[in-house]
Regions:
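Catalytic centers of hydrolytic enzymes
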Residues: 1-214
Length: 215
């Protein structure tokens, strides 16, 4: 559904990889019940979706093929989506220091076919934006094993190299930890909004005291 967005971190252990899940632009409420519609294969836990087996099933008796064709017939001129809704983001697990270089691997930024192939990605850490080119190649050495990237997570990869300027710590002259929100944009729009809650921790040094200032 176009009202659902999520992020995942493929470097995390199984069961901990989903790092955010938004419905209608807001984080899901763990105290609410949600209705999920899909084919029986996925609802039975296929493709490693075991969480879908925990709900109460309602079988409608329709074939996905028939409903898909009905939808296309009722929506003349429908166009393929360009904005991805599932993005792989691996952020530093430890705090970073200003001017310290770190990398942010990204996956699933593009569709494998059609108009939704982004050429660029922008990752913002608070007000600091860093840009990178996107690799949309479908060639993959590990296409059929667990080291797969494209087969598992889709096309559109980038490894962003970033370092944050000392100015990010201007609001924290006393030093200590600073939390910066992380957002991700492609050529087609925002794919990881601030509401996703992804962050980077920055360790700010104590600001140097100006000559003549009172201690």
């Amino acid at each position: 559904s176009k009202n659902v967005q999520y992020t995942y971190d493929p470097s995390k252990p199984y069961g901990e990889r989903i790092t955010s899940l938004l419905v209608n632009g807001a984080p899901i409420d763990m105290n609410k019940n949600y209705t999920v519609g899909s084919v029986t294969f996925l609802l039975a836990g296929g493709d490693t979706f075991p969480a879908l087996t925990r709900g109460t099933k309602t079988v409608l008796g329709n074939l996905d093929r028939d409903k898909f064709n009905e939808y296309l017939g009722a929506h003349n001129g429908i166009k393929a989506a360009t904005l991805k809704q599932a993005i792989g983001v691996t952020l530093p697990s430890d705090p970073v220091a200003p001017e310290q270089e770190f990398t942010v691997p990204l996956r699933g930024l593009s569709f494998s076919e059609g108009p939704g192939k982004t050429q660029n990605v922008k990752v913002s850490f608070g007000s600091v934006a860093v840009n990178a080119s996107v690799n949309n190649s479908l060639r993959e050495e590990h296409a059929s094993d667990e080291a797969s990237i494209i087969t598992t997570d889709g096309a559109g990869q980038a490894t962003l190299k970033a370092s944050l300027p000392m100015s990010v710590c201007a609001a924290k002259p006393e030093g200590g930890a600073l939390t910066l929100p992380v957002t991700v944009e492609t050529d087609f729009g925002t794919v990881v909004p601030e509401a996703s809650g992804l962050t980077v921790q920055v360790t700010c040094p104590v600001a140097a005291q100006q000559p003549g200032a009172a201690a």
